[in-house]
Design a protein with these regions (language model features):
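AMP-dependent adenylate-forming
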Residues: 32-41, 77, 98-125, 235-242
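Conserved adenylation A10 loop of the ANL superfamily
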Residues: 118-120, 273-285, 301
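Conserved AMP-binding/adenylate-forming core of the ANL superfamily
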Residues: 46-51, 98, 112-166, 183-188, ...
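A short N-terminal helical cap/helix-turn-helix that marks the beginning
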Residues: 53, 61-75, 91-113
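Conserved AMP-binding/adenylation subdomain of ANL enzymes
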Residues: 294-312, 321-361
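Conserved pre-ATP/AMP-binding loop-to-beta segment of ANL
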Residues: 108-110, 232-233, 244-275, 282, ...
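Structural core segment of the AMP-binding/adenylate-forming
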Residues: 166, 170-251, 351, 358-361
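A short helix-loop-beta submotif of the ANL/AMP-binding
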Residues: 137, 150, 156-184, 194-199, ...
Length: 361
């Protein structure tokens, strides 16, 4: 099959889905649902796309209903104020991203699979993940963390980072993360802006066969951030070393088994802070909300990526990249996610493909 380019010449398409696959996709199911439930007669993708950008209230209201978003209070409108900046989406709604992400966790099915260069393959079942998130969220509350407080992390792409993000969201606190390949100055350029109350950090990691210890850096960060009241160490490398004075053990904080509790927050309540690249000065914080991320990522994972409960999702990503956050929210459609902390081309150049094959991604 070929398509015409702007210059009028034809080029060969690398791949196009079969009609059977298209008809069986979640995008097709959503379109059929819209036709039936909303009485909007849409034929083909172009009409669906046109409706999505022309009728914002109708489309995003349909996304909310189609995915049956969990909310303790329903919104009074979809788009109450269209001014930009300042648009107001789903006023009156109260929900929590972590609750919606974890609702599809199955007790005995893998939710998170962790691969790294130096540790055995680690699996968190749905039961494990929900329990650890609830335990850490309870410990954060016991530390005095409240909705709107910032929790900063200095962690690699490992299952513990997934737990920490979701626990922070469960409390209604605001997550922000830098990868441990960042130096002290790069991290402080970001975290000083947000004044975190809790700092979670890794003891070290292995990349390309080389151990990189990070306890000294974590101590420097903790000392340079006067807002930090508690420092938590994730023992990943386990190479020894002295943790910062008074540091708490992540393993101990996730050992409890309390009932899950999810703080109900407004749709636009801050969820996490990402950062610009820093090429034009100090990196700028970019805030995303519980509701906005939930709807956008449900749409992306289910409709665009055609992902569901029988799928496994793997993204090679640093925790400092927004695509890592997207990996985590694949849990919201019931998928299993695979994390990898290590070199993408060692021990062999096809390392990432080997992981995909072994984990049936």
């Amino acid at each position: 099959m070929s398509e015409a380019t702007g210059a009028g010449t034809a080029r060969e398409l690398l791949w196009t889905p079969s009609e059977r696959r298209t008809r069986g996709s979640r995008m097709a199911d959503f379109q059929s649902w819209v036709n039936r439930d909303r009485a909007v007669p849409l034929i083909g993708y172009d009409e669906l796309w046109g409706w999505s950008v022309e009728d914002l209230d109708g489309f995003w209201g349909a996304v909310w209903s189609y995915f049956d978003v969990l909310a303790s209070a329903r919104p009074s409108a979809v788009l109450a104020e269209r001014a930009m900046p300042g648009a107001v989406w789903f006023p009156g709604a109260r929900l929590n991203l972590a609750e919606n992400v974890l609702r599809h966790a199955r007790d005995d099915r893998p939710a998170v699979v962790g691969i790294s260069e130096h540790r055995e393959r680690e699996v968190l079942t749905g039961r494990d993940l929900v329990r650890q998130v609830a335990s850490l969220a309870g410990e954060l509350r016991a530390m005095g963390v409240r909705p709107g407080d910032r929790v900063a992390a200095y962690l690699p792409n490992i299952p513990q980072a997934v737990v920490a993000l979701l626990a922070t969201a469960a409390v209604g606190a605001i997550w922000s993360c830098c990868a441990p390949d960042f130096g002290t100055d790069g991290v402080l350029d970001r975290f000083r802006q947000i004044e975190p109350t809790v700092l979670l950090g890794v003891d070290g990691y292995r990349f390309g066969g080389r151990d990189v210890e990070r306890l000294d850096t974590l101590a420097e960060l903790s000392a340079a951030l006067p807002s930090v009241r508690h420092t938590v160490v994730v023992e990943h490398l386990r190479a020894g070393g002295t943790p910062p004075a008074g540091a708490l053990s992540f393993d101990a904080l996730v050992a409890g088994d309390p009932p899950p509790r999810y703080e109900q927050v407004p749709f636009d309540h801050p969820l996490w802070i990402l950062y610009s690249s820093g090429t034009t000065g100090v990196p700028k914080g970019i805030v995303h909300s519980h509701g906005g991320i939930l709807l956008e990522h449900l749409k992306s994972h289910a409709l665009h990526f055609d992902t569901g409960p029988d799928d496994r999702v793997f993204v090679f990503a640093s925790t400092a990249w927004m695509v890592w956050n997207v990996l985590v929210t694949a849990l919201a459609v019931g998928a299993t996610i695979v994390t990898y902390d290590g070199n993408p081309v060692r021990p062999e150049p096809d390392q990432l493909f080997a992981i995909c094959a072994a984990e049936r991604v």
